[in-house]
């Protein structure tokens, strides 16, 4: 079945700006309404580290082409089982679920397999383009900024994996994300997300360099962590194999810079509560274990009262 990309522009009158959203895959069985964004979810400030934010807007452009190849060690199946378990424990066996920062749609697809009506939201056209190649008519993909997202209907749950939350660099922007989560959830709806920990940034990633070489491509990851600002920067250099009429392999070079912020649990809890959400628990990533001093990633669970 052919999937169609539809460009849906609208005017946000409150801020006199032109917001361009993409709705991808119009074959969704129950298309959601596309409506004007609520001003309460559109109060993103342009002050602060605007340069970094502009860089983030361009992130995952080249990397999207080889993301699944280099991220094949990510335990999406384990994550999806955990998320489904938590949703069902809270009486959510079906209904609309948002995958916020869905990337290429791997986790989104697994949650659709579990019976949920999935809405994948991401700000990267290239990542969504890769997700669209899965040709899964059960999933509605929306190109939206996490800080302003609006699924169109109240949903039963919002999930955000793969440290997507760490890409929100300013606390006021993260509060905007959480506020939009709160606005999107039904009463009693669940919010599940993961974040990288201070231990991962300070000890494991630090100022290290990682490299990997495969037939399809290679990458060099140069990491820098500023402990004072709590900002992690990593510069990616990619060499991606391209088809050639000659026998010799041709590799095209791409460069990207990514930024993430390290958040303390106490700060997250405060921002959640200020956004109308109730902090429930934090665990060592995708387990029911307590957070340890050497936990690399944690899972946070909250709900809308």
Language-model features: locations:
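A short glycine-rich, Lys/Arg-flanked "PGG" loop and its adjoining helix->strand segment in the class I
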Residues: 175-187
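SAM-dependent methyltransferase
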Residues: 192-271
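Class I SAM-dependent methyltransferase SAM/SAH-binding core
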Residues: 98, 105-148
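C-terminal lobe and adjacent flexible extensions of AdoMet/dcAdoMet transferase-like proteins
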Residues: 259-305
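A short acidic, Gly/Pro-enriched loop at the edge of an enzyme's catalytic core
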Residues: 150-157
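Conserved class I S-adenosyl-L-methionine
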Residues: 53-93
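Short hydrophobic targeting helices and cationic amphipathic motifs
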Residues: 13-15, 28
């Amino acid at each position: 079945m052919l999937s169609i990309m539809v460009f849906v522009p609208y005017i946000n009158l409150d801020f006199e700006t032109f917001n361009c959203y993409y709705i991808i895959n119009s074959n969704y069985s129950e298309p959601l309404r596309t409506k004007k964004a609520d001003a309460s979810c559109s109060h993103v400030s342009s002050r602060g580290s605007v340069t970094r934010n502009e860089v983030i807007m361009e992130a995952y452009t080249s990397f999207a082409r080889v993301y699944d190849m280099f991220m094949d060690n990510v335990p999406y199946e384990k994550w999806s089982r955990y998320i489904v378990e938590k949703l069902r424990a809270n009486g959510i066996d079906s209904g609309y679920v948002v995958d916020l920062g869905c990337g290429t749609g791997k986790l989104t697809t697994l949650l659709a397999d579990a019976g949920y009506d999935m809405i994948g939201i991401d700000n990267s056209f290239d990542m969504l383009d890769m997700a669209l190649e899965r040709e899964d008519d059960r999933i509605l993909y929306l190109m939206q900024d996490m800080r302003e997202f609006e699924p169109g209907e109240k949903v039963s749950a919002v999930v955000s994996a793969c440290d997507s939350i760490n890409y929100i660099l300013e606390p006021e922007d993260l509060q905007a994300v959480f506020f939009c989560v709160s606005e999107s959830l039904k009463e009693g709806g669940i919010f599940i997300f993961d974040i990288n920990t201070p231990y991962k940034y300070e000890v494991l990633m630090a100022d290290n360099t990682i490299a990997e070489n495969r037939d399809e491509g290679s990458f060099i990851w140069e990491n820098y962590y500023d402990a004072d600002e709590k900002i992690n920067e990593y510069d990616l250099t990619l060499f991606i194999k391209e088809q050639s009429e000659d026998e010799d392999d041709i590799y095209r070079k791409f460069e990207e810079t990514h930024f993430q912020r390290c958040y303390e649990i106490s700060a997250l809890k405060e921002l959640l509560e200020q956004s109308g959400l109730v902090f429930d628990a934090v665990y060592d990533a995708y387990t029911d274990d307590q957070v340890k001093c050497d936990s690399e990633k944690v899972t946070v669970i909250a709900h809308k009262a």
